[in-house]
Amino acid sequence: TITIVFMPIGESTKKMKDLKAGDAFMDFVGPLGQPSEFCSEDIEELKKKRIVFVAGGVGTAPVYPQLKWLHEHGITADAIVGAKTKDLVILEKEMSAVSNLYITTDDGSYVRKGMGTDVLRDLVQNQGKQYDVCVAIGPMIMMKFVCLLTKELNIPTVVSMNPIMVDGTGMCGACRLMVGNEVKFACVDGPE
């Protein structure tokens, strides 16, 4: 059994929202790309790292299994989840079981009003938290502002480029980007 987390925006996802457990898809591809970089790190070294995740909207879905994996290996990370409204906060119970969870909503309808970057800035500048790495997954604009903040705070940051994937094979080139001086494809080499 798999769980698919999506937001009904386009024609396909609007049709998907009407499917019930047990209904079938014609085709399904995934997972795409490579596992999280954490999976290849030495666990004892990873336990020394202070890690923060910033998730926006449905970007919370790929953050959860990473947090769960870390938790299963004795590592507790901080997680900041941002959503437009209370109704769009997902996986709260699951996330709080495997991380130190902070929630913010754009409209202030749940927990704290503001953006994930507001919480991250507060944790570092007002609460004295220090992080060795930040992982940001969510809308491109959210990841941009997380990167601007983490650059200012001198926190190395990993982003997920899954929003730009199209065909998942690297053939179309839509998810091509430069990492350093090397061409990478989010769907094959990423998404992080």
Name each region found by the language model:
Residues 80, 84-192:
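Reductase modules of NAD(P)H-dependent flavoproteins
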Residues 1-23:
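Ferredoxin-reductase
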Residues 50-52, 78, 133:
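Structural motif
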Residues 32-43, 187:
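Short, Lys/Arg- and Gly-enriched loop/turn segments at beta-strand edges
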Residues 27-28, 177:
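A generic structural signal for residues embedded in beta-strands
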Residues 25, 32, 50-52, 57, ...:
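Extended interfacial segments that mediate partner engagement and assembly in macromolecular machines
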Residues 30-31, 180:
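Short, surface-exposed secondary-structure boundary micro-motifs
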Residues 60-66, 142-145:
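Short glycine/serine/threonine-rich phosphate/pyrophosphate-binding segments
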